[in-house]
Amino acid sequence: MSPRKTYILKLYVAGNTPNSVRALKTLKNILEVEFQGVYALKVIDVLKNPQLAEEDKILATPTLAKVLPLPVRRIIGDLSDREKVLIGLDLLYGELQDSDDF
């Protein structure tokens, strides 16, 4: 069995809006179910830290970025569809590969 990777994620939000709160809640649920402690999530409020959004070229919120493992992947907007989030971040393939016990 190969060692599990640690996933480094950044969630960019704009304040404490309903969309931001929903995105964070949904994402935490996905991460706890799918990655059980092998992730680090940094939430960045672009209203409080606009320089970080500018450095990372964030144009819309919410934006979720998978920084590590490479390649970097981003999802912009609605994070409510678990499968789309996992596919968009290139995480579902590994999950499927690990469960090939047919």
Swiss-Prot record:
Cysteine disulfide partners in this protein:
none
For this protein, the record's Pfam families field holds:
KaiB
Q: What is the effect of changing residue 40 to D?
A: Disrupts circadian rhythms in vivo, cells elongate
Q: What does the record say about induction?
A: Transcribed in a circadian rhythm with maximal expression at 12 hours and minimal expression 12 hours later; expressed as a kaiB-kaiC opperon. Down-regulated by KaiC.
Keywords for this entry?
Biological rhythms, Cell membrane, Cytoplasm, Membrane
Please state the protein's primary subcellular location: cytoplasm
GO MF terms here are: identical protein binding
| GO BP annotations, alphabetical order | circadian rhythm; entrainment of circadian clock; negative regulation of phosphorylation; regulation of circadian rhythm
Q: Does the record carry Ubl conjugation as a key word? A: no
In the UniProt record for this chain, what is stated about the effect of gene disruption?
Answer: Not essential for growth on low light, loss of circadian cycle and rhythmicity. Cells elongate.
Q: Per its UniProt record, what InterPro entries does this chain match?
A: Circ_KaiB (IPR013474), KaiB-like (IPR039022), KaiB_domain (IPR011649), Thioredoxin-like_sf (IPR036249)
Name where it's found: Cytoplasm; Cell membrane
Its membrane topology is listed as:
Peripheral membrane protein
Q: Name one GO cellular component term.
A: cytoplasm
- What does the function comment of this entry state? Key component of the KaiABC oscillator complex, which constitutes the main circadian regulator in cyanobacteria. Complex composition changes during the circadian cycle to control KaiC phosphorylation. KaiA stimulates KaiC autophosphorylation, while KaiB sequesters KaiA, leading to KaiC autodephosphorylation. KaiA binding to the KaiC CII domain yields KaiA(2-4):KaiC(6) complexes which stimulate KaiC autophosphorylation. Phospho-Ser-431 KaiC accumulation triggers binding of KaiB to form the KaiB(6):KaiC(6) complex, leading to changes in the output regulators CikA and SasA. Circadian oscillations can be generated in vitro by incubating KaiA, KaiB and KaiC with 1 mM ATP. The cycle is self-sustainable for at least 3 cycles and resistant to temperature changes. A very robust clock is reconstituted with KaiA, KaiB, KaiC, SasA, CikA and RpaA; output is measured by transcription from an appropriate reporter.
Q: What free text does the record give on domains?
A: The C-terminal region may confer species specificity; C-terminal hybrids do not all rescue deletions in S.elongatus PCC 7942. Has 2 forms, fold switches to a thioredoxin-like fold (KaiB(fs)) when bound to KaiC. The KaiB(fs) form binds faster to KaiC than wild-type, thus less fully phosphorylated KaiC forms; the KaiB(fs) form activates signaling through CikA and inhibits signaling through SasA. A mutant locked in the KaiB(fs) form binds the CikA PsR domain.
Miscellaneous comment: 'Kai' means 'cycle' in Japanese.
- Give the record's family classification: Belongs to the KaiB family.
Q: List, alphabetically, the NCBIfam families matched.
A: circ_KaiB (TIGR02654), PRK09301.1 (NF006798)
How would you summarize the oligomeric state and partners of this protein?
Undergoes a major conformational rearrangment; in the free state forms homotetramers with 2 dimers. When bound to the CI domain of KaiC switches to a monomeric thioredoxin-fold (KaiB(fs)). Monomers, homodimers and homotetramers are detected in solution; at low concentrations only monomers are seen. In vitro forms KaiC(6):KaiB(1) and KaiC(6):KaiB(6) complexes. Only associates with 'Ser-431'-phosphorylated KaiC (and not with doubly phosphorylated KaiC).
- Can you name this protein? Circadian clock oscillator protein KaiB
Phylogenetic placement of the source organism: Bacteria, Bacillati, Cyanobacteriota, Cyanophyceae, Synechococcales
